[in-house]
Amino acid sequence: DEMQLEGAMHNSESMAKLLGLLPHDADLEALTMSLLEEQVGGFYDPGTKSFYLMEGFSGDLARAILAHELTHALDDRLYDLDGALRERIGHTDKTGAYMSVVEGSGTELMNRWVMKNMARLNPEAMREFSKMGTESLQDTPTVIWKPMMASYMAGQRFLAAGRTHLRRNEKIRDPNVALERAFTAPPLSMEQVLHPEKYWSPEDRDDPVEVVRATAELPEGWSVVNEDVFGELQLSLVTEFADG
């Protein structure tokens, strides 16, 4: 399994460099880990069922991080996050869509915890938390940080849109129903996450259409190194680079 994950990282790096999204001397794994160290105060590893809190975080900051990461642990217990992510290896668009549900869930509950406890929280600690890691984004290639940030921000909006749709159109007021639907029948593309009506609304539902590669046999000496599926978010990064 580890070799499969390492191979996926290597293939992603090669493709990003080929498309001009990464400098040729860049190390995708090292850059990603560096960003995570600055951006993330803790994380839950569904593969080992373990939770980690970075050194230097305590008090209110640690509690806010715990609210987010322990949500992942609960979701994993219910929906097997590790199994779902492994099924999506090699399909960047589906992986991004699923991670948006995962991170949207964690972000929502964390924000609810912060709002509920706002009166007793340390204002300075919360200010530090809100800007945590923002400086490191300036030195990180867009192809790394933009999909990561989208999973938090767009994922939260996606789930909120689902609850609104269910309340208005199906008279369902239980906020957990939207989350359960999103996990048991996850969005199939980042397009559906970025435009929630294309997932939640039966009239506007827009599932991705598989494009079958219909090329002739590869010339002698050529071989397929990697195959992947890009969606709206990833293609926007490619066109953004081309326009720049």
Residue ranges and their predicted role:
Residues 1-27:
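A metal-dependent hydrolase signature that marks the N-terminal structural subdomain at the beginning
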Residues 139-244:
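Pan-zinc metallopeptidase signature
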